[in-house]
Amino acid sequence: PPVIGSSTLAAVRAPEDRFDAIAGIINGYRQVNHNYRRDHEWNQWFVVTAGSRARRDAILAEIEERTGCDVLALPMRTDYYIDLEFPVVNGDRFARESGATRSVSEPASGGQSDPRASGTDASATHISEDARGDLTALEADLLLAVQDGFPLSATPYADVAAEVGAAVDDVLTAVDRLRADGCIKRIGCVVNHVVTGFTSNCMVVWDVPDDELDARGEAVGRLPYVTLCYHRPRRPEQDWEYSLFTMVHGREAAAVDAKIDELAAEHLPFGHERLYSTETLKQTGARYDELVASGG
């Protein structure tokens, strides 16, 4: 998460005849935990998470040198909504659909707009590129112990406590602190959304005026079919004019497109592009070994 280390979304324009070789170079970095092909001029999109901003930027520079491709670096500036929630046992067409108890625009009691109309906290959280996290030794050990998940046992916290050599109560207190600080977003099952039928996803980038970003981002983050919403910088020197990113996950491509049409017509009347994911090149969890160490 952005409260530990320094991360960025990045992209390259990989020529088709070198696409696989370039993907191999990028995926070879353990600091790269996601890489996707998207149907756009910028056709490889990956995430780099390193122990420091300097190390992150050095990796991007190495990728440029080794691939011969310009890197479009787009670190997160503001988080409006990030929480992938996929229904497993019902027929919902979109992630978060069942959580929408009423229209986002429908006033709550007292006539005031309810920022949690769909059970969603879509407030603006500004992100530092230099976040390091102020971890105790136990918290660092705990993150390393659970980075691949808690043990699937009747006593997962006791098992982890034994692994890190701490009392169970101390582990529970540390987990509470890590959750409160955002180092651990949630504890639960990780759902493979593709297996559950959510095979269509689209990253939509929007040219939203700077003075409207927070208001638009918070409003869109409350929509029940938007799974991610965040602000990233424009890069006009690389012909990248987009500042707001949204993700829509659904079971059918046509339904996803229809929701994006609705998003453009009713909420974001600005220029935009749709970048559909067409291939997963790499997808792993973030590795904490470097992030919890000094330097890196």
Regions found by a protein language model. Give the residues of each.
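A compositional/biophysical signature of low hydrophobicity enriched in polar/charged and small residues
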Residues: P1-G296
